[in-house]
Curated annotation (Swiss-Prot):
It comes from Saccharomyces cerevisiae (strain ATCC 204508 / S288c). Gene3D superfamilies: Ankyrin repeat-containing domain (1.25.40.20), Transcription regulator HTH, APSES-type DNA-binding domain (3.10.260.10). Present with 589 molecules/cell in log phase SD medium. Pfam families: Ank, KilA-N. This is Regulatory protein SWI4. Residues 37-147 form the HTH APSES-type domain.
Length: 1093
């Protein structure tokens, strides 16, 4: 059926209701069944949107510039499955022009094809829908254009696009009220405007309404918006600069965790008093300069003493940090700012850093109305960034820095580490490269070498720096952006066209490589990392893309990538974090590291736990192999509300991750802004501070990780933690079996008896950042009631073994140990069994062998894993044998059913053959002259015969009526004459009878008037009698004629069936019945025979 016919049929079905663009007045009308066409804008592209009120999810888009149709939306309206849509698009895309759009606004994504191609596909697959037909047949009318959808559009409110697509679309929680209030009208108006902007830019509410998912971004959104509206950027920079350096100084001076928390609280309180919420960033690592964007700035440095003094300062900082690592694990290794001797230079550098940070934070909260102001801010900050980067590069002394474009050309080359195996910087003056003499940074202190090393080396120069200035990209900014989007649209990084990728270098002049692709603030580097496109990542880094720029939710590139599975599928996450390692250790706008988000994703049921575990292992190995202290700093780093990764795992009751982080060195004593430590959170849920879960922390993966970490730092910490007097015995625990994990087996030992468990098993080693089990349990042993929280909603649903490890039972255990010293072991065991029947269950816990000096106390809360393995195996064998028996019986039953089905199929085939022969015989018996080959021919023959029979009936009836017409007329005439004669004879005697009594009445004769009246009355009676008699006779005649006609019909019907009767029909049916069906008809035959008899 052609497309035009489909459209015309659809119009006929709708009573010729033409679809026209609605006017703005119709936008406020209630729901209707007519399609609506509006103009909307997605990613700076105008489209026609067609939908029906109340069914906004069924929408089809058509681009205004070229009339291309989103065919994916058409197939969705036709209710094609995803598999069917994919097959159709793969089949049809080979012969037609198409364009795939990925990323950006969700509703805009899909496959776009020209209008004619869309009509062809709709015609081919017979898709009939008013929305599809309306958008395909729509013609633009300049006099009545479609309205442009406003912000308060119905579609905007009810569209599914407003739903969150990520578990980290966090809800903004309430903040403290400002103590100081202003009474001026301008301040009030500014506050109202700030609240309005804050409501516009407020993140979508999270579906995981848990305490864990309330991110630190809540403390700075409102305050930052007020800063932008009041144009108070100078005060913001100074305040943020002071707070950051105060925190850095506290940590670098070996201050303990309590001092950091007090400093953090004071910052938090001062931030609200000053209408600004400062962000704690003690782990701020400044970007190391790579290539330079501005090549026209003079690079000569007349003062060579600056670089010498700066080199001396670097050595001092590195030596002091290495010496302090043995004493305190919370020190930070901070890259110095450069040899800025004067106070003015330092102040200028601090302002640059503060501006860069504030710029990233403002980009995350500004709306679409402030794009012009943001562009100006971008240009000024970028210019200042490049100038400052040149200053840093003239003085910075980097020993081993890999050349990014070399790894781009040869992906097999590995990146050189910044540090040697001992964790200190190497003081070589040259950069080692694989067969290349190009230097990224040079430490030679003459002017010529500095000029040579400061040039930006490109993949095209390859040592020929003289031709670098001649390279120029002739593409426009829009074409350059489109090229990047084309490369991003490739589903796999291996499909990237290398020639197309090479056209990106160099970027057009004054082009902002950090431009935002979508309305969520993502840069090309964000999507390149999320799509695991390593060649594009390397090219963007070569073009000076800012790896630390955050989107509007505050995520950097690595954080964006962990929400997708592409890096895992492409096996590219290790290489990506080696390129963007700065993102692993630099906090984002939320004050968080990527590791914080991984902890949250580990409890998200929509994420594959194997992928999240793989990401987590890669980050731990990457940080731990370079510097174990750096790994511990990241594990203990607090976000804006003071939560470490260990806090998040404790709040989610994620025992597996909790045990693992404690094993790797995470501290359980750090307090967040709610004055809660991970240990207190675990105790709040009646769980020991060391953590307890179905999987303990001394797994094979963690032991393997410990072997892969730098041996010097690892064994130094092990020797420091081991002391002769603390030979702690670790209770052995059975490890759970996870089918999706790497560890599928565990070394299970025989459970210890009660006599083997002594007091030393409940002690904790004196390692740093560890929790003493005796101290915690003694402090909590006075609690007589269990504590619940929003995480464990119902105490009845809590596993019983978790409650067995409560402080109350610990108090009983300590009392039993003291009684054990006074009484004999046999008597004491009998008494303890009466007092506490669960004691034997708690103390007899099997375990695994593990390093005794590195692990905290572990106690499994799940009693089902404490049973001996032999019992579990016996039960499993019993279940397997029962299942085998049941399956055998089912298989036998199925075999019998198969045999029966095959026999019935063969019988049906025989019956079909018999019926076919009977039909042929019936055709042969009926057909005399012309053969009958099918049922349709037989039906046509029957129709012809019946029509012929009807015509013969009519002819017979007419002949009967003609033969009886004369006789009928004669009979009627005779009857009429008889009636007339009877009337005359009867009228004369009546007159005589009336006239005879007249003379006898003397009174009547004397009155002539009475005589006339009687005569008149008699005449009237006679006339009425005649009329009634005539009507009676006419009615009788009519009835007789009707009976005659019915008799004629009966005669004709009998004549037509003279050769057939009911009995003959029954006999014919009996002859045609097969032997199988004759039994069912015997009863009817017997009834008919008895009735006739």
């Amino acid at each position: 059926m052609p497309f035009d016919v489909l459209i015309s049929n659809q119009k006929d079905n709708t009573n010729h209701q033409n679809i026209t663009p609605i006017s703005k007045s119709v936008l406020l009308a209630p729901h209707s069944n007519h399609p609506v066409i509006e103009i909307a804008t997605y990613s700076e592209t105008d489209v026609y949107e067609c939908y029906i009120r109340g069914f906004e999810t069924k929408i089809v888009m058509r681009r205004t510039k070229d009339d291309w149709i989103n065919i994916t939306q058409v197939f969705k309206i036709a209710q094609f499955s995803k598999t069917k849509r994919t097959k159709i698009l793969e089949k049809e895309s080979n012969d037609m022009q198409h364009e795939k759009v990925q990323g950006g606004y969700g509703r805009f994504q899909g496959t776009w094809i020209p209008l004619d191609s869309a009509k062809f596909l709709v015609n081919k697959y017979e898709i009939i829908d008013p929305v599809v037909n309306s958008i395909l047949t729509f013609q633009f009318d300049p006099n009545n254009p479609p309205p442009k959808r406003s912000k308060n559009s119905i579609l905007r409110k009810t569209s599914p696009g407003t739903k969150i697509t990520s578990p980290s679309s966090y809800n903004k929680t309430p903040r403290k009220k400002n103590s100081s209030s202003s009474t001026s009208a301008t301040t009030t108006a500014a506050n109202k405007k700030g609240k309005k902007n804050a409501s516009i830019n407020q993140p979508n509410p999270s579906p995981l309404q848990n305490l864990v998912f309330q991110t630190p971004q809540q403390f700075q959104v409102n305050s930052s918006m007020n800063i932008m509206n009041n144009n108070d950027n100078h005060t913001t920079m100074n305040f943020n600069n002071d707070t950051r350096h105060n925190l850095i100084n506290n940590i670098s001076n070996n201050s303990n965790q309590s001092t950091i928390i007090q400093q953090q609280k004071s910052i938090h309180e001062n931030s609200f008093n000053n209408n600004y919420s400062a962000t704690q960033k003690p782990l701020q690592f400044f970007p190391i300069p790579t290539n330079l964007q501005n090549k026209n700035v003079a690079l000569n440095n007349p003062n060579n003493n600056d670089s010498n003094s700066y080199s001396h300062n670097i050595d001092n900082v590195i030596n002091s940090s290495n010496n302090n690592n043995n004493g305190n694990n919370n020190n930070l290794i901070i890259v110095p700012d450069g040899p800025m001797q004067s106070q003015q230079q330092q102040q200028h550098h601090h302002e640059y850093l503060t501006n860069n940070f504030n710029h990233s934070m403002m980009d995350s909260i500004t709306n679409g109305n402030s794009k012009k102001r943001r562009k100006k801010l971008n240009q000024s900050n970028e210019q200042q960034f490049y100038n400052q980067q040149e200053k840093i590069q003239r003085h910075f002394k980097l020993m081993k820095q890999p050349l990014l474009w070399q790894s781009f050309q040869n992906p097999n080359d590995h990146h050189n580490e910044y540090c040697d195996s001992n964790g200190s910087n190497n003081n070589n003056n040259t950069v080692a490269s694989n067969g290349s003499s190009i230097e990224v940074f040079s430490s030679n202190e003459n002017d010529n070498s500095m000029n040579m090393s400061s040039r930006s080396m490109t993949p095209f120069s390859a040592g020929n720096t003289s031709s670098q200035n001649k390279l120029e990209n002739k593409m426009t900014d829009q074409e350059y952006k489109q090229t990047i989007l084309t490369i991003l649209s490739s589903e796999r990084s291996s499909d990237v066209d290398q020639a197309l990728l090479a056209t990106l270098y160099p970027a057009p002049k004054n082009f902002n490589i950090n431009f935002e692709i979508d309305d969520q603030g993502h840069t090309p580097l964000h999507w390149a990392t999320a799509m695991a496109n390593i060649p594009l990542i390397k090219m963007l880094i070569t073009l000076n893309a800012n790896a630390l720029q955050c989107n509007k939710l505050g995520f950097n590139c690595i954080t964006k990538s962990i929400f997708y599975n592409n890096c895992y599928k492409e096996n590219a996450f290790d290489e990506i974090i080696s390129i963007l390692k700065i993102c692993l250790i630099t906090p984002d706008v939320n004050g968080r590291l990527p590791f914080h988000y991984l902890i949250e994703l580990s409890v998200n049921k929509s994420k594959n736990p194997m992928i999240i575990k793989s990401y987590m292992d890669s980050i731990i190995l990457s940080l731990g192999q370079q510097d174990y202290n750096l790994l511990k700093i990241c594990l203990n780093y607090q976000d804006n509300i003071g939560n470490t990764p260990l806090h998040l795992s404790a709040l989610n009751l994620n025992f597996e991750v909790y045990n693992r982080l404690v094993y790797l060195g995470a501290s359980t004593d750090i307090l967040n802004l709610d004055n809660e430590s991970p240990a207190s959170i675990m105790n709040k849920f009646n769980t020991p501070a060391g953590g307890s879960n179905s999987r303990n922390n001394n797994t094979k993966a963690d032991r393997k990780l410990a072997r892969n970490l730098p041996q010097k730092n690892y064994y130094q910490q092990q020797q420091q933690q081991q002391q002769p007097q603390n030979n702690v015995k670790i209770p052995k625990i059975i490890k759970t079996q996870h089918p999706d994990k790497e560890d599928s087996t565990a070394d299970v030992n025989i459970a210890k008896t009660d006599s083997e468990v002594n007091e030393s098993q409940y002690l904790h080693s004196n390692q740093p950042n560890s929790t003493n089990m005796n101290t915690i349990m003694e402090d909590l042993s006075n609690i007589n009631s269990f504590v619940t929280s929003s995480v464990i909603k119902d105490i009845k649903s809590t596993p019983s073994k978790i409650l067995e490890n409560s402080p109350i039972l610990y108090r009983r255990r300590s009392q039993s140990i003291s009684d054990e010293k006074e009484k004999a072991k046999d008597n004491e065991n009998q008494v303890e069994k009466k007092k506490d029947p669960l004691n034997s269950v708690k103390t007899a816990m099997p375990s695994l062998e593990s390093p005794s000096s590195l692990l905290p106390i572990q106690m499994s809360p799940l009693g089902k894993y404490s049973k001996p393995l032999s019992q579990q195996i016996n039960k499993l064998n019993t279940k397997v044998s029962s299942l085998q028996r049941i399956m055998g019986e089912e298989i036998k039953n199925l075999d019998n059913e198969v045999v029966e089905t095959e026999s019935s199929i063969s019988n049906n085939k025989k019956r079909l053959i018999t019926i076919a022969h009977q039909i042929e015989d019936a055709f042969d018996s009926v057909s005399n002259k012309t053969p009958i080959n099918s049922i349709s021919d037989l039906q046509s023959r029957i129709k012809e015969t019946s029509s012929k029979l009807n015509s013969e009936k009519q002819n017979f009836i007419q002949s009967l009526e003609k033969s009886q017409a004369l006789k009928l007329a004669t009979i009627v005439q005779d009857e009429e004459s008889k009636v007339d004669m009877n009337t005359n004879s009867s009228s004369h005697p009546e007159k005589q009878e009336d006239e005879e009594p007249i003379p006898k009445s003397t009174s009547e004769t004397s009155s002539p008037k009475n005589t006339k009246a009687d005569a008149k009355f008699s005449n009237t009676v006679q006339e009425s009698y005649d009329v009634n008699e005539t009507l009676r006779l006419a009615t009788e005649l009519t009835i007789l004629q009707f009976k005659r006609r019915m008799t004629t019909l009966k005669i004709s019907e009998a004549k037509s069936k003279i050769n057939s009767s009911v009995k003959l029909d029954k006999y014919r049916n009996l002859i045609g019945i097969t032997i199988e069906n004759i039994d069912s008809k015997l009863d009817d035959i017997e009834k008919d025979l008895r009735a006739n008899a």
